[in-house]
């Protein structure tokens, strides 16, 4: 592995568990929280390597962290990046294996 390649497990942080993401699974689209510094090509290669599926497209969105009032003044939650991954064929068994 060269110095420019990242480990796929460092790129894909976690699946998004929400009502909207469950609805997208029926369309063959899966939503993940990813490293904010990663690009669409890195996300595609990481998904293909981890889950062994063919990726058709990757859509990304950056979510700004909310500003919240705390006991010590104003604080800010961290910014996150999400990726919506469309598959050519097959499926990912992320949510069915949870006990």
From Swiss-Prot:
Superkingdom of this protein's organism: Bacteria
GO biological process: translation
GO cellular component: ribonucleoprotein complex; ribosome
Signal peptide: none
GO MF annotation: an example: rRNA binding
Keywords, ordered alphabetically: Ribonucleoprotein, Ribosomal protein, RNA-binding, rRNA-binding
The keyword rRNA-binding belongs to this UniProt entry's keyword annotation: yes
Family (UniProt): Belongs to the universal ribosomal protein uL23 family.
Function: One of the early assembly proteins it binds 23S rRNA. One of the proteins that surrounds the polypeptide exit tunnel on the outside of the ribosome. Forms the main docking site for trigger factor binding to the ribosome.
PANTHER family for the chain: 60S RIBOSOMAL PROTEIN L23A
Oligomer status and interactors: Part of the 50S ribosomal subunit. Contacts protein L29, and trigger factor when it is bound to the ribosome.
Name of the molecule in the record: Large ribosomal subunit protein uL23
Organism expressing this protein natively: Clavibacter michiganensis subsp. michiganensis (strain NCPPB 382)
